[in-house]
Amino acid sequence: MTVGLFGGSFNPPHVAHLVVAEVVRDQFGLDEVWWIPNATPPHKPNDELAAVQHRLAMTERTVEGNPAFRVCGVEVERDGVSYTVETLRVLQDQHPDTDFALILGSDSLDHFADWHRPDEIAERVPFIVYKRPGAIESVADPRFVNDVRYAAAPVMEISGTEVRARRRAGRSIRYLVPEAVRAYIDTHDLYRPTD
């Protein structure tokens, strides 16, 4: 089995995530895409981060209905910072007959050399990279150039930052997130001003 690992804060998961995951799955013939919400992302500030149980629940609602997508809680179940290399070690030990690939935005690839143990990550899995607005097109560090495949996913100007800002401003987020996620955000009153 070939599986794409799609990690992120998913704060919240939105339709661009869905489009990227499906395009990557189709283009590279992946059997499944495992969505991995980061419990404690090392490169993101926690000031706007919804509680991990909310982000996990929203991600589950995002993938329902697509049998090739599943949510993997490996980082949620682990204490401490969510380092990709540790996630790969665990998943490769648990699933020795599965071929994994790491799905990354081009913005993440731009700073990949700064990640925790990037050489080990590159030894463990190939990268499938999708373009993010404003990111550099090429691999910044030549050590990783042979491990990168590029996805032909459309560049979508939707981000979790935009969704949260619209929500704080009292504006609609309909069609930016799946309807089940929008309902969850409303029910749990997420991303509202704290004043």
From Swiss-Prot:
It catalyses: nicotinate beta-D-ribonucleotide + ATP + H(+) = deamido-NAD(+) + diphosphate. SUPFAM superfamilies: Nucleotidylyl transferase. GO terms for biological process: NAD biosynthetic process. Keywords: ATP-binding, NAD, Nucleotide-binding, Nucleotidyltransferase, Pyridine nucleotide biosynthesis, Transferase. It comes from the Bacteria. Pathway: Cofactor biosynthesis; NAD(+) biosynthesis; deamido-NAD(+) from nicotinate D-ribonucleotide: step 1/1. GO terms for molecular function: ATP binding; nicotinate-nucleotide adenylyltransferase activity. It is an enzyme of class 2 (transferase). Its EC number is 2.7.7.18. Signal peptide: none annotated. HAMAP family: NaMN_adenylyltr (MF_00244). PANTHER family: NICOTINATE-NUCLEOTIDE ADENYLYLTRANSFERASE-RELATED, PHOSPHOPANTETHEINE ADENYLYLTRANSFERASE. Belongs to the NadD family. This is Probable nicotinate-nucleotide adenylyltransferase. It comes from Salinibacter ruber (strain DSM 13855 / M31).
